[in-house]
């Protein structure tokens, strides 16, 4: 991850904070989200440096969200390894994940041109709200023993998985002349991969395996 630190906080202290995050990124997944962003660049045609920044933001958000997911799901394994909170504790893992969320926002603020900053922050906020709405409803149904309707489930899936997809594409469009609305395609992709992930979790002998 980006090693730049603030004047008030040195690199050594930061490394102590983000040990759970560094632990999970050592055992990387397939980086599907990065591949998807690169695929969209076939149409959007943004520069390599901007693409690199956006890809980094999405991967950081995804990996930090996994730290929280494992706590919320009472998981014991992630990608075949013990979950971070079983090693570093719940409190430190939550703090590390939240810290990375704000590091992503800070990276966006530092690297994006000032003239598009308000739009970028608005997109960042809206898409993370969508992600947490989807995750929140998923948790609510699970803990309340409520079986959602098919439409409610589809809405949850599109928020939960489509949030990061949408964030990446919309940030890219801030630097692109292609302003077509990709929302429907993003929703379809999010729906496909979340349903596939849920199905694999139900059928797999190892429900903790992370496939994406």
Question: What is each stretch, according to the model?
Answer:
Residues 11-212:
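Mg2+-dependent prenyl diphosphate-binding active-site environment of isoprenoid biosynthetic enzymes
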Residues 1-8:
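N-terminal amphipathic/basic leader segments beginning at the initiator methionine
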